[in-house]
Amino acid sequence: MHLSPRYDGDIRALTGAPRADALDALVEDLRAADPAVRDDGAYVTAARWIPMLERAERHRLGDRITVHFTDPAVQARTFAPLVLARIVEAGDWREAWWSPFAEWYPAERDLRGHDAELGWLHAAAHGADLLAALARHPGQEPSRLTDLAVARLLAPTAHLFDAQEDDRLAYALAQILSRPDLGAEKATAWLVPIEKAFRTGEPGPVPAWASNTMRTLRMLYLLADRGLRTRNTDEPAHGVTHREAVLEGLAATLAVVAPYTG
């Protein structure tokens, strides 16, 4: 059985070499420059197939996708966390995948949301999606998740988020802050480096990283206040674990750049 270029095949109908070949083709197409191949074809198929794969197959897929974090092609790098997020949502995660992701995420310099030729790139948003998925996966240390989100926000950049990347990062942070095992101190400790960075501000144009961070924290304040829903589920809205402390911490941090607040 051979899959069409549109991935109309059902992975459950494949066994042996044809199944392995189909997964090999999927991995290769997930780095394709053509968005019709990468996004509309391979990624949509990956999202459909991943829950149906054997656990060992998901691990092999994750191992191969993680290599994409050092790929010279930006679209390969930026789609890697999106695929890993789907693997995490299917219930699997390997600790070996963390370091490649954590090294890439704050270091990625191409933060364009959409490119006319390459289609969606969305590095900041896709990385946030993986953080959000990990926040709901057992055994994750909340502090390293928040620390990585902060590292991405504070990394120097001239790119102003223009495709709701701030919303996606805020959502990821809200999911992390919703973990029941999160201690009260850790619920706000991650704000300390942001406050320090804000205090380095000088008169003149607001740096892109600062504007991106301000907007992320403002959306997070809304989510912490109103609650959040888990995307792609029918679960009711839930709140962050230490709501009052988080709201107070966010307000105090934002007041550094908005001294006119009450």
Name these PLM-found stretches.
Residues 1-55, 194-262:
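N-terminal alpha-helical scaffold/docking segments in eukaryotic complex subunits
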Residues 47-50, 56-190:
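Eukaryote-skewed repeat-based solenoidal scaffolds used as protein-protein interaction platforms
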